[in-house]
Structures are given as structure tokens and as C-alpha cells.
């Protein structure tokens, strides 16, 4: 190689070189003129498609890589411009000396450029760089690049590819498969040179290039068959090509350049020839690892100077802008090829410029991959042609992302650099696999596309050569620095290589790199030939990978010593040799590797004649080792490793200098991974913002809190009152369950957390932190736990206080509350958040009178510019503004103001001002007070979607001031302003604060109201309390209601607390029994109520009732689980009120347990109930279970058992037993007595329950404004029920008989409790109910908002408890229930009772149904619970009821199913319409719910009683 380089530099064609250089210079000048662009355009265009040429810094990076290259570039520029010819002559002499045959071959392809290419491919490949520099020195550098790019890329694509292949073959014969890439790059350079030279020179050079291509082919064949050469070319593209690029790179690149020069001279014919020959040479060169590949290690080091050449080329070439990247890539490649073949040539040889032009498949690939793969270069790891890109990268710039880039771009498109940059990216991956996969795609490219691509690549190579030469001329050191920087900034394929070479800072290195580049370019040039392309592609990926590694090494070396080109070369060579050994010979494309490859090529005799450019001994060793490695094995290994390496290469952005590049791709990968791992640390501080996380894991678990009790239920979990163990501070824990979340974490919770963290205001609830129920975050992987949002604790909420009746708010209190509320809301709105769920239960109040807005689960960021619609299904119905009811989806903060206006009215009236259960009814209520929405008062209302479909029944005028005349004038003004129909006319929160009513209010100076310090009044508590009151205040209604709630709440609420639940269970039992009896007759309904009261009284009368005993007494069939539960449950004596005749007076336990539950507000058993609340809760759940089972058993056996039981007391017991299975939740000890007494009481108590059933208006739940008829029905219903129960009891159904027996038993017990019962049945029942309601309140209040009261909640807002909801929220619900379930029972009035009778006939079981249904009714949303408890029993009841009930039962049951017992009865009954509602509302599963629905009606009345609107 050195001899050849010497020959190329000094001798061998000195004249031809000088002439060629002069011609090339002339041509360059021509091309500098607009003429060159046209040539470049076709060539550059495909390259243009590819990523833009590496930026000048990349070029500089490449340039610094090779001081020699820079020197060569300078020499080239100087020689090209003036001293170029002498340098060329020297190079020619050297090239001739180095490889006479190789140089001749190269000369053959080139006239003048070929001489340079000879230099380049012979040792002068560096010389070629120098030669390129010379040519560029001629002043033609940019022009030559463009010209060469155009003519060479065309010719090079044709000839260049052919000549590259030939040169590779010639060089390959001489220097091994590396020759082909070298020759192809050489052809490009030759083409460039030929363009620079007279066309005759080009022609001669094309002829030479053809000859060289032929020689390379011969040598390829000599090397060992096309496949061996192919594999070699692939491997040598990566490894051997580097060595051979050094070897054949010198000869092949010089020869290739000659070829391309000659090809350039005859641009069209030469191009065709080149394409054909390029395909051949590519095939051969791909077979033989291109010398460029072998040489790339050295060339890379030298390439460090190349970037300068690149710069020069870019600056020199007017078209450089377009092709700069390809040219620079090619130039760097060609420079490398040149450098490797003739280090002496340094940048003087026109080849260096021509190299970019040179059509060598490698250079082309490179140039395409350079330009194309500029993105690839960025990726640095993804060079499509691992051969050129990786090896180029590695050897090229230690800095260097640029190296990667160049390698990528080069190796990327073996077919064509310009095909498409998108392709180049695809080829990035391809190039790695290209060696293996190029053939199919390459075949296509081998066609005209391949030729064009090769041309483009040549043009790029020419531009790259020009830029490299210019960069070399500029400064080797600057180029090295720039290359390092550029490499760091982005791994540009060519520039990166150039950077590496520049850091090598050896002109020889640059030449070697140029030679390598040329060879590689030849190999990649798609026009070389399908096989060549495939082989080269295959070879290139490993080459690129190796080069990338080498470049990384070189980058390291460059960083360490940009000036020390040898060190970088050696480092690159070492790593390359290692990588080549590991991966394949081609894989080691470091600068030293290139030289070594050249040397190895000599050793391997791939390119024996080509003198190797001066190489480091290490490089030589690496080359020899690489050469020793089998080409095929190397190819495979290189391909595999190249891909991995390319993938492993760190991205240029990650590499600040060349450190990462200097590192092996794997090292870079590791570093990248480390960075990614560090990112969590970066995020960690962000999480640190969420103090919760730092506190959470391990430090802040929910175990750090003592949970005191449940205070509410939210949309995604319960809310607990808790005490911080560390600080003793009271907090509210909002549980966020993850179990049922499909998305992992509830969006409402995420939204609430996100928003609350942005809101800091004294009137907005403060979220302190977030804790979990796991000690370790890893536990969440095993078991989805729960998160707890920790809030400051607020003692009350507005709804609980208003519902409690314990507090009276005066005007000043209301002013203070509204002032604080509007301040918080104004803050939210100024922060652009809509709360969208303002209601009394979300307004929290502490004992200091401070108001805080809570529950931001529905809140969202508001943007007036946002076009996306919002959902209008927000805000609880009672507080929903008319625009949302009419379908507005682009609402404003005015929606929250309306809600606050509703609250203002509620503070004065103590009840919700608009209580409807449906949107249409809600709009009707609003219209009655605020006037009907119409364009006159609300111009935009006509634009709303539902304006025409939701019109009120008639037009109302605004009566707000008349209706609320009792409100103070200032408050009324604000009230009127806040409830303006037109949201645009509605006041804003800020305006509200400026109104007369709130202007001068200072809440901090105002005394707080006299709040109940002993009781926290929350919504849940209020609901429970309401239920209890309902149970106590309205025996029948509350009894029915309570049982229903108990059913739904019983099991659930039993946990909450409520002896009521237990009593309701017995009540439910009684109801179930009475229902069983009346299933046949309408009166059964009332009996059900009576029986409920009787059962409650019985239970109360008994000191203690063991549920298991009760079940046994009743002969209720219970499963083992239920039996166990029942064994655990003892009915408190308090629940029974007194130990009367109940056979199981084991109440001491129950009583004691009762005190635990003491929440029942019933007069008689309040304390015991309070004590036994917990017990009652358990009892309630047990009762619910028992009732369900009893109902089932009753339904199945009701007929026969009832008939027989009527005849026999045992029969009654049996019937009761049958019934009790539905009543599993009614634990009554002494059931036999109870049954008897119940039967007795059913008769006796029926009137008594009727009395309590009739409630004073105060006790009655307020009528929902919309469904007053329902209210009437409720009242009528109660009366009817009272009477009807008697009728029912009197009616003799098998169930009726059983019920009668039970009622009698109850009555017997009750007579003892009669005093109690009047006050006690009502209240004991009430207590039972209270406990039930209390239970419900506890459970229901929490679930009330949900659907604890199925019928209530289902109908009305689920926010209020059934009664409260009915009255407060649930009036609408009540209405719904009334309209639906109760409506069916009520609407008929007495006929409804018959309907109920029918429904209860189904309902005697239906009564149990009522229980069960009550559960479902209570949980309209929890139909499952209802069915769990009552569904089966209902079915049983329905079945038994049908036969026993007779036609009525049969009709309801058959018509509706037992589930439809109530509904079926209703249908039959006059309450058909309401029944229809009930049926429709309840749905089949809720049909029995209609029995419950019946209760639901009762609960409706209770709801009203519960409602704040009525005297409560």
C-alpha cells in the first residue's frame, strides 16, 4: 500500500494525475458554475432525498479526524488550485509505485482523477484525499464534487458503480474485496476527477475504471468466487474492505477514481458503463470487502481531517448546499478511501473530492446514507449500511455521532443515497441487514433506480469529497474539533467519520479514510450491481458497525488527541480489529483498522499489489487479524454485530463531545440506559413536588392514622374520619379503590388530585397528602390496594347540618357562609376551574364556622377558547342550571353560580328549592319559580339542543321574588341575580362578592353558629338519621321503607350501625310474612306493614333474640354461611324493646351489642339501639339474608305451608319458616311465639301500625315539588296501607294466614309493648326502623347518595337518603318511586292497595319481597343486593304466591315474575300507570322491588318526612 500510495502520489501517472487534476479543477470550476449543479442535481437529488450533508461542524469533525486528511485537503486545495498538479504527480508516482497494477487499474478508470484514485486506492488513498485536495486545490473542489457527483455519480452509478466494482475487483484482485468499495468510491472520485479533467480524461479514466472494474472482478474471482468476494466485500466492507480499502483502497480507490474519472469524461456512456460495471464492481467489491471497509479504521482516523475537506467541498461547491451532505459524506468516504490507500496523497488528490462523487457502492451508500441517513447519523446506531456507516463512524470520529451518521448514511443506502431519505432511514436498518437483505431491494435499485441512486451517491461523494477537501484545506485541527463537536452533536455518517479521521489528524489517515470511503462508497453504490449491492449492503452493515465502533474509538482518541491521528487510529484499529474479530473483519473499520485492513489485504493477498498507507502496527495487526478471519464468517458476524452495534450506538445528542462515540456502541448503549435510569431520579424530584410520594412509601401508610369511622361515601370510595397518630390531628381520609378500576386509577381521583394541588385557598378544602394501604410500593404489583387522599377534617357539611335540624342559621351566618363560598368559587374560576358539583353536601363546615368547598372529582379546567364540548351531565340535579338541562355543552362558570344560588335559597328555606327526580321535572320546577326559558329573557336559549324537546308544560312567569319574599331584600337581590335563567346575565362569583348582601361581610369576625359539637353532621350521618326518623315517625311507611332500605342497606348497613337494620329485618320479616298472607289479597300490603311493625315490636319486646334461634324458630332455611352469621348475631333487647314473649330472650348479649349500635333514635330503644347499633347492623344484615332466604322458601312453599300452617300453629310457624327463609335477616328468638304473636299481632297490630303509619304533616317527608300527586299518594297510601294492611290481614291467603299467625304472635308480644308500640311500635318499630333507618342512614347515608335507596336514589339524585332525597334530593326520587313503585301502590289509592295486595299477593312473598325489594328499592343501583337478598326469595314468593295468592298473585307473578311481583300486581291494580312506572322503573329485577317500590313509596313519604322542607 505505501508503495502504491507513493506511486499514486509521486509516480504512477504523475502526468495523468496532473492533467487529471487540472482537468478536474477546470471541471470543478465548470461545475461551480451553474452547469455543475445540473449534473449534480440528478446525482445530488437522490442524495438530497437522503438526510442533508453533515453540518460544517461535522465536516470539521471529520476533518480534524485526520490531520493528514486536512493536510491532504490543504494540499489538495493548494494543489488543485495551484500546487495541485505537483501533488497529484507525486501522488501519481506514489500510487504507481504503490500498486502499479492497481494504480493502472485506477488510472484506467480515471484520467486525472483516477490517478488520484490510484493514489487513493493505492496507498495514496490518503493521497487521494490529498489528491482530492489537489483536485480541490485546483479550485475545482466544490465544482469537482458537484461535477463528479453529477458525472461520477451518474457514471459512477453506472461506470462508477461498475468501475467501483471493477476497481473493487481490480483492487479486490489486488487488494481484496475492499477494492470494490474503494474502486466504487474511486470511480466516484474518478468520475469527479474525470469531470474535472477533460471529458476525454474522464473517458480514458472511465475506460481505466472499466479496466479496473474488470481487474477488480478478476481479483474478486481470484479472491475466491463472487460469494467469497461478496462475503468478503460485505465483511471487507466492514472489515476487509477496511483493510482492503487500505490495500485495494489505495489501488482500487485510485483505480476507481480513474475509472470514475474516465466514466465522468464520458458521463452518459461512462455512467452507463459505470452502472453496469459498478454493479459488477459492487458485486465483486461486495464479494471482496471493499478496501474502503478494510481501510476505514485508518481512513477514519484520517477522516478526522476529512471534515475539513467536506467543509471545503461544501463551500467550494455551489451545489454543495444540495449535495453537501452526500458530497461530504462521499467526500469523507472518498477521503477515507483515499486516505487509506495513499496517506501521502493527503487531500491533494482530486480523488478526495471525487471520492464523494465516486459512484462506489460504499461511497454511494455512504453518501446516500450520509445524506439520507443524516437522520441515521443522528441516530448514530442505525446506520443502514453497518459496513460503511458503522466502520466509518467509529474510525471516523471519536467524537462522533457524525461518524455514525456518515456510516449510517453510507451504509444505509447501498442502493442509492438519493433514492429517498425516508428510504435511507429504512435502509439504516436495511444496511445492517443489507448485506443479507440487499438483494431483493437492491435488485430493484440495481435497475435505473440503482443507477440514479449511485449517481446521487456519487454526487454526494463528490460533494463530500469537495467538502472534505475544502475542510482539509481549511484546517485539519479545526475540522477535527468541528468533527468532534459535530459528532457529539449528531452522529452524521460521513462527517462523523470525517471527524474521527480528523481527530486522527493525519493526512495519511485522511487519505486512508478517503480510500476506505471510496471503497465503501463503491461497495454501497447501488448501481454496482444487485449482488454487489446485496453483498456490499451486507458487508456495509458490519462495516458500519465496526466503523461505528472504530469511530467511537477514534472519537475517544480524537477527544484525547485530535492531533494524534495515530493514537485514534490505533485505538480505532484495536477496537475495530476486536470488533472485526468478534463480528467480522469488515467490522473493524477504524482508521488503524483500515490501514490494517489494507495491510491485511496484502497479508490476505486480497489487494497484495496495493501499497498500504502508513499504518500503525496495531492497525496492521488488526487488519491482519481481520484478514485472517473468514470473510463469510466475518460477514455474518459483522452483520449481526453491526446491527447490534449500530443499535447500541448512543444517540449523538447524548454525546457531548466524542466521549460516547469514543466509547463502544455497547458502552454508549449502557450509558444511554444509565441516562434513562437516571431520568426517574430526575422525575423523582418532580414526584417530590407531590410530598405524598416522599412521605408515602414506607413512611406514610394509612396505618399512620387511627380510623375513627365512616363519615361519607364518595364516587370512588368511602370517606373516613381519622386521627394522625404522629400529630394527633384529625383528618378525613378519602379512599380511592383500585380494585374495580379498568384504567388503573379512577380518573375522577386523578382529576381531583391534580386540581386540588393547584388550588390553595382558605375556602377550598386542603389536600394534605396521599397515603396508601401498602407499606411498599411494590405491594401494588401483587395486590391492587387503595390510595387515601388526606384532607383536613371538617366537622360538618351543610347538608348534614340542614338535615339535622340541630342548627339554626341566621342571616349573618348565611352571609358568612355565602361570602366564604363565593370567595372560594371566585378563586376557582379565576384559576379557570369549574367545580361542576356544588351542592350542600360538598360544602364543608367546621365548628369554627369556616366554609370550605370540597369534592373536586367533577371539576375541570375551563377554557373559553376551547371548542371541545363539555359534558352536561354534571352537577346534582337539584342544583343543575337550566342551560345544562337544555343540553348546553359549552357552558361557563355561571353553572357554578347557579348552584350557589340554589344553596343560598336552601340556607333560608332549610330545604332544596328545586327537588325533582328527572331533568324534565327539574326544568319544570325551575320554570315555575324562575319563569320558563324563552328567547325573550334568554336570547340564546333557542340554540340549545333540548330547547324544543324539554319545554315546560306551560309558560310560567318569573315568581322568584314572590316565592321568596321572606328572604331579606339584599339576599333576595343576590338570589335573584344568581338564579338568572340566561347564564350571560347571571352574576359571576366576583360580582356576587361585590353585591350588597356580601360586600361588607368578614367571616373571620362573625361568630360561628351554635353548631352541635357532640355530633358531626355529615351527609352520611344525616341520611342514616333520616332513615331512622322515617322508621320511627312513620311506622308503616318507615317500616316498609326501612325494611326496604334494610334489605338494601341491611346487609351493607348492618356494618354501618343500626339496630334499626335489625328491627327492619324483623319488620321486613313481618312484612314478608304479611306480604305472604296478602299475596292473594290486596289487604296483604297493610298486613305487611303491620307485620313489620309486629315483628319489630316482637323483636323489641324480646330481651335478646339470637338470629340462629330466630331462624330455627321460624324454621327458616339458611345456608351454612348465613347460619354462622346468624349465630354471631344477637338481636339486642333494645331492638326488641322489651323482653316479652319472644322465645329467645338471650338479649343480654344482644342488648349489650345493642348499646354498641346505639344509633337508633327510636324513643324506646334509642339508647339500647345506640348501644346495639353495631349489633343491629349485623342483625340487619342477617335479617336481610334471612329474609331473602325466607322469602325464597316462602315463595316455594308458601301455598302449602301457609294453608297448612293456617290450620296449625305449627303451620303458621312453618309458613313463617317458609317465609322466614326470605327473612333471614330478621333474627328473632322465640320465633314460635313470635310467629304466633306475630299472627296475633298481624291482626291486632294491623290497626296499630296503621295509626303510626298516619304521620303528621311535619313528620311526613316533604313532597317533591314536581310530583305532589305522589305525595298525596304517599299520604293516601299510608292511610290506605294502614287500612289495607287490615284488609290484607283479613284477606285469607295461605300467605295471609301465615302472616296473620305471625302478626298475632307479634300482636301478643306487642300488647305487652302496646304502650311502647303506640309510641313504641311506631317508635319501637320506629326504633327498629330507626335502627333500620339509622342503619340505612349509616349505610344509606353513605350509600344514599349512591343508590342505597334503590328506589329513592334510582329515581332522584343519589345524593340524598331516600327520604331526604325524596324530600331533599329524593323528593324527585320519591316521586319516581311514588310514580313508579309507590305510584303503582299509591296512585290507585285504595285500588292501589289492592294493587299492592296483588303485588303483595305476589308480595306476601311480596312482603318478604318488600324486604328483599326494599333492599333493591333502596339500592336502585344495587339491584344485585336486592336480588341477592330478595331476588331468589322473591322468585320463591312469586311462585308460592301465585298459587297461594290465586289470580292476583298469579297475575302479578306470572305477569311480572316474582321480581315483578310488585310490578305485576301494580299492573293489575288501578295503580297500573304508576305500576307501569314502577315496572319500568324497577325493571324485572326491581319488580319485587316494587313491593319494595311500595315501600319505596312509603320511603317516599318518609323521604318527605325526612326532607328538610317539611317540619322535620
From Swiss-Prot:
Keywords: Acetylation, ATP-binding, Disease variant, Host-virus interaction, Intellectual disability, Isopeptide bond, Kinase, mRNA processing, mRNA splicing, Nucleotide-binding, Nucleus, Phosphoprotein, Serine/threonine-protein kinase, Transferase, Ubl conjugation. Its EC number is 2.7.11.22, 2.7.11.23. The modification Phosphothreonine is found at residues 588, 871, 1058, 1246. Residues 92-109, 210-220, 418-435 have a biased composition (Basic residues). It catalyses: [DNA-directed RNA polymerase] + ATP = phospho-[DNA-directed RNA polymerase] + ADP + H(+); L-seryl-[protein] + ATP = O-phospho-L-seryl-[protein] + ADP + H(+); L-threonyl-[protein] + ATP = O-phospho-L-threonyl-[protein] + ADP + H(+). The modification Phosphoserine is found at residues 315, 317, 325, 340, 342, 358, 360, 383, 395, 397, 400, 437, 439, 525, 1048. There is a cross-link at residues 519, 547 (Glycyl lysine isopeptide (Lys-Gly) (interchain with G-Cter in SUMO2)). This is Cyclin-dependent kinase 13. It comes from Homo sapiens (Human). The gene is CDK13.
